[in-house]
Amino acid sequence: VVRHAGAMVAEDLNSFDDLFYLAGVLHAKKIEGGRLGAISGAGFESVGMADSIVADTFAMEMGALEPQTVERVEEILRSKRLDALVEVRNPIDINPGADDEAHLQITEAFLHDPNIDAVVVGLDPTAPSVRALEASSLRPGFDLTDPQSTVHLMPLLVARNAKPVIGVVD
């Protein structure tokens, strides 16, 4: 009965812990529905996100992007010279060449789309354009301590928006 009402039911203690954690983290966010936006810098991850939105205890769907969202994401990709490599859709593989700013701007575009109720963002810390690793003499100033890194800017973006954002770091 509760599943039919939209509740997620934990099948075991580990699942309960995960659901309890998510409930605590997302308690201030308003979830309007089950339409997901999925962004990743790796193709396998975006496919995995799409394949994992239906389970025994819940079902979501990939939200259809509004034309304005598609245009905005295309602009971002053009500015990053990734437009020839990336097709705008949901889920979207924004390519390992996408930098922190691209991750943030595309997340924001998805958050503003009325057909998206929640966003999942995958970040690959080993991608060459992302500031997500410890400081290194090989890339001075281009690490997670940089104030322009996703580590510092994503929490601000999440705080400004009512929709939930889930981050995945591979």
Q: How would you name each of these model-derived features?
A:
Residues 1, 146-161:
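Catalytic-core regions built around general acid/base machinery
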Residues 1-13:
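Conserved thiamine diphosphate
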Residues 3, 32-145:
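Short glycine-cluster motifs
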Residues 10-37, 108, 112-113:
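Structural signature of the thiamine diphosphate
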Residues 15, 19, 102-106, 149-153:
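Well-ordered alpha-helical segments embedded in enzymatic catalytic cores
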